[in-house]
Amino acid sequence: MNEDHPIARVEPLLLIAIGGFVGATLRYAVSATLPGGFPWGTLAVNALGSFALGLLLYEARLTDLLSAETRLTLGTGLLSSFTTYSTFAVETTALDPAMALVNVGANYALGFLAVIAARAVTRGSLP
């Protein structure tokens, strides 16, 4: 099937939609299981999603075993819906200033550390 065929043009959208449905559902499930008072669910999904996306991208680069469709479904679809910047921003503004700083620092620090850890895992060793 060539790239001009209507199905070939719709396929990426369907792959993203399927991944997005799964990612958003998983995000809701994680957030629903963690205690309130602090946005633990958003922090957890952002850190886990950063780790998973790091694994996906570094593994794809190192092994070249993941197809473009797999990267699109898992990266753009599932993990982009699993992690959430907008919820992070809204929840942060609802916190008192000291806790808002903790939340911002924790989200960014854990996100970067998760990507670094994923990179180390794909290379076969932790730093």
Describe the predicted segments one by one.
Residues M1-P127:
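Membrane-interface helix-loop junctions in multi-pass transporters/channels
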